[in-house]
Amino acid sequence: MSVSKKPMVLVILDGYGYREDSQDNAIFNAKTPVMDALWAQRPHTLIDASGLEVGLPDRQMGNSEVGHVNLGAGRIVYQDLTRLDVEIKERTFFSNPTLTGAVDKAVSAGKAVHIMGLLSAGGVHSHEDHILAMVEMAAERGAEKIYLHAFLDGRDTPPRSAKSSLQTFEDKFAELGKGRVASIIGRYYAMDRDNRWDRVEQAYDLMTMAKGEFQFDTAVAGLEAAYARDENDEFVKATVIRAEGQADAAMEDGDALIFMNFRADRAREITRAFVNADFDGFARKKVVNLNFIMLTEYAADIKVPCAYPPASLANTLGEWMAKHDKTQLRISETEKYAHVTFFFNGGVEEPFKGEDRILINSPKVATYDLQPEMSSAELTEKLVAAITSGKYDTIICNYPNGDMVGHTGVMEAAVKAVETLDHCVEQVAKAVESVGGQLLITADHGNAEQMRDPSTGQAHTAHTNLPVPLIYVGEKSLKAVEGGKLSDIAPTMLTLMGMEIPKEMTGKPLFIVE
């Protein structure tokens, strides 16, 4: 009979940052007796989850993709944002063969260069500076028809902040004397990741056919009209931008389409609508044979050229476990399932040997303030069963509530989400202790601890650059080390499990045996 395993469990409370000021702080204002007691009585510390400590630009807020890559890799992983910033600064971006090849092919055939992406300074899914560089590259290489299809943010940026970005691009096109903003639409439609194809279809039709609910002469006018309709950036409806006498920007066979988002999860659905021959998310009214370029690899099964292929990461926590014949479980809801699997494994889609996965469906609601508990009850039930099964050496779980409800900007809902999490943590900690296992509780970045922007008074829907908690629950008598970061978690787990740390992991263990 096999011996029951005592699992090393990592619970990631998504968007659960640490901030001592109680003002607009959903975590502080929630009733959290369990987390309060654990923080008071167990070994704990604060760790960095943003900026240079996770391979992002200095003081850049953290995010879920970056957080999970660092958590699983056990080393600082330089993110696409930082990599692209450097490429543009050193001008190697302007000679990237995939990008220049697509532009040159369109130019020589007299075709258009379409550029789409999230027009945002948020730096989570994209950065407008990269899009600006792409526009400049297309113009420098002789493209006459340059069409920008702008997805508006308001989620990783303040809810109404797109005007200055759109103005920057309208000014740039005026300066170049060619090209224009051809369409605007909120990311709610263009960047869905939950198979809500009715939303994606509106973005697809807008770009392929130049057909939308609204049409305006300029992007700024289109945005102001959306605000007058009470639509924040994220929810701006499909709007064609075309002045009297301007050519239609509908896509044609042979045009280039360059997708400037660097984060994969919200880029996949719209990409598949453009490139998959067997696409069945919705009936496409117009199928265009485009020269489609993805900035980074959105998924291994999307077979189009990629300007910046992933750098492979050897010996992530998942791979190291598999090499040592350890069993592991990854478990989360739909919203963060990719994070505990694909991202935690360093961008590897295929599960490792001995790696099981459990996906709990996130509730089908328009926005998660309507159901702040999300699917946490079912997630906890499955997680507790896995902990007590004796089957797993390590379990990685993500609770999305703090982040997904934090993004809505609704304080009462975020408080409810945090209180729900407290109840879940109680059950998980009890289960771990009942089998003599070990538990680390942490977060990938902050969000719910800052629900209002003090400078603007608007709802704060974005992530923060604040530290996150790390708490140990288990039988070992440990002392916490200060100054940690997300990439120290994997080495910490290995140390607690009595395993060797691979040389690729440069993180340090954050608890020492007293």
UniProtKB/Swiss-Prot annotation:
Pathway(s) of this molecule: Carbohydrate degradation; glycolysis; pyruvate from D-glyceraldehyde 3-phosphate: step 3/5
Cofactor note: Binds 2 manganese ions per subunit.
UniProt GO molecular function: manganese ion binding; phosphoglycerate mutase activity
Positions that bind substrate: 125, 155-156, 187, 193, 263-266, 336
Active-site residue numbers: 64 (phosphoserine intermediate)
Quaternary structure and partners: Monomer.
Protein family membership: Belongs to the BPG-independent phosphoglycerate mutase family.
Protein name: 2,3-bisphosphoglycerate-independent phosphoglycerate mutase
Organism name: Enterobacter sp. (strain 638)
The organism's taxonomic lineage, starting at the top: Bacteria, Pseudomonadati, Pseudomonadota, Gammaproteobacteria, Enterobacterales
